[in-house]
Amino acid sequence: MVLDKLLYTGYNVSTECGYCKSGRKTEHFGLLAEKLSCEDYQRLIDLGWRRSGHYLYKPNGKTSCCSLYTIRLDSYNFKIAKEQKKAIKKWVKYVNGKPLKPMKSEISTDYLNNAFQTIESLGAEKYSVTMEPCTYTDEKFEVFKKYQMQVHLEKEEEITKKGFSRFLCNSPLFNEDKGIKYGSYHQMYRFQGRLVAVGVLDLLPHGVSSVYLFYDPDMSKFSLGRISACREIWLALECGYRYYYMGYYIHTCPKMKYKATYSPSYLLNPGTNKWIPIENFTSLWNTGAPKYISFGDENNSDIQTAVDYDSSEDSSQNEDDYTLFNRQLPGILSVNVAESLVSENFANIGNSTFPTRHVLSYFPQVKHWFVEINAAVGEEVAKSYTLVLSS
């Protein structure tokens, strides 16, 4: 078995939330991954983790200004919404030059099949959607730069090839089963030979995870976000992936409201790491419930909440002393369980890998790193990583 290679970065407090721009703090536990199996990343996603390049992070919804919930769609039971159909019809008419042929079937998956097969059978010189490795090219970067400048209003000097590569091309994921297409990819959308959009995807054992989408802003009127999401759901269906992961959902963030329109969707319950229909959460939020909600039992009757929390007002503790335990990061293992797993951990020093019993006799001060990582990654991943102490 090839071990994951992780570097400890610990509990982090950011000075500004990237979602609400309120100036209040946001908190997460983070790791750097040199290597991470697709199977273990699947396990981590189902514990509330996400990746940005090689950086892995698990947000703390209890103590952050915005509560981030992992959201996934059951692709096998997808029910297409009116606005999604409208976007697809408009796109098909533009690409094909004529309206989408009506269907008798009301089944959503049949609708996706009809629409995407219609335009993707026109020939590559007209229209194509292809999958390729997530490598850097100048062509991709130019579309990305144009998108960031016009859609996200970033300055040109802030958008670099290095930053693009780090964010959307570099990936720690590896696949031991060479017969199955897992890993990180770019889904390329071309119209009349021109690159118009790129979907950054992680293909995992149980689902397609959408990392990012960027497109030519000249095509903004075609709602390519909706088109790409439906195309990625179709990819999941065609390749046998049960779930479609759309990253995080924040109910108070207007830009994320669209994710709730893809049905049936589920949110990861932060306290129990169980998937619960999104409607169970939104019905409470829409009636004034706090932004952090966790259902405490299988019947969803024991509801735990946290008051709207401003970590900038917490002066009782130095931020350097924060840990995932004293900050009550939801959904982690207890200290006792995490400590019991240390005997099964490994450490990497130089080119050699050692069991922790040898390493801790020389470096006892790093034991708490193993304990924190074990608590955050869960029992299965805790048994399959080596902690890089020096390279």
Swiss-Prot record:
Keywords: Acyltransferase, Cytoplasm, Nucleus, Transferase, Ubl conjugation pathway. One of its GO terms (cellular component) is cytoplasm. GO terms for biological process: proteasomal protein catabolic process; ubiquitin-dependent protein catabolic process via the N-end rule pathway. Its main location: cytoplasm. It is found in: Cytoplasm; Nucleus. It comes from the Eukaryota. It is an enzyme of class 2 (transferase). Its EC number is 2.3.2.8. Transmembrane segments: none annotated. It holds the Pfam family ATE_C. GO terms for molecular function: arginyl-tRNA--protein transferase activity. It catalyses: an N-terminal L-alpha-aminoacyl-[protein] + L-arginyl-tRNA(Arg) = an N-terminal L-arginyl-L-aminoacyl-[protein] + tRNA(Arg) + H(+). Belongs to the R-transferase family. Involved in the post-translational conjugation of arginine to the N-terminal aspartate or glutamate of a protein. This arginylation is required for degradation of the protein via the ubiquitin pathway. Does not arginylate cysteine residues. This is Arginyl-tRNA--protein transferase 1.
